[in-house]
């Protein structure tokens, strides 16, 4: 298994075509103060999906964490291959600074894309 922790656009050109079984990512949401947080910029999704077509096997699952409104934006970048969302219930809520103005956030979405059905091992739990 190879695990990369880097800018994907620096890594993708060096990956062998059709060699990826699972692409797990946590994209920048683009929801923070854009003047101070250079790392939270929305990526070029056309470029991302182009590379995915090259490096991923047809039954590769592309999985990303997200939260609204970014979840909707992410799904819209590849509606054709979007399959479903799961909900990650966090053990600790976030958003304490706005707790007097809105509910704290206790979950994130897990967004799943693929072209062909990947291996799926149901856990049969509720």
Specify the residue positions occupied by each region the protein language model found.
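Core catalytic lobe of class I
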Residues: 1-126
């Amino acid at each position: 298994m190879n695990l990369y922790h880097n800018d994907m656009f620096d890594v993708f050109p060096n990956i062998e075509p059709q060699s990826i079984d699972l692409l797990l990512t946590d994209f920048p949401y683009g929801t923070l103060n854009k003047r101070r947080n250079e790392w939270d910029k929305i990526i070029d999704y056309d470029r991302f999906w182009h590379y995915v077509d090259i490096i991923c096997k047809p039954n590769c699952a592309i999985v990303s964490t997200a939260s609204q409104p970014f979840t909707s934006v992410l799904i819209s970048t590849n509606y054709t291959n979007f399959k479903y969302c799961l909900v990650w219930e966090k053990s600790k809520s976030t958003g304490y600074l706005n707790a007097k103005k809105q509910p704290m956030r206790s979950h994130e979405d897990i967004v799943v894309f693929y072209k062909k059905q990947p291996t799926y091992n149901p856990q049969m739990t509720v």
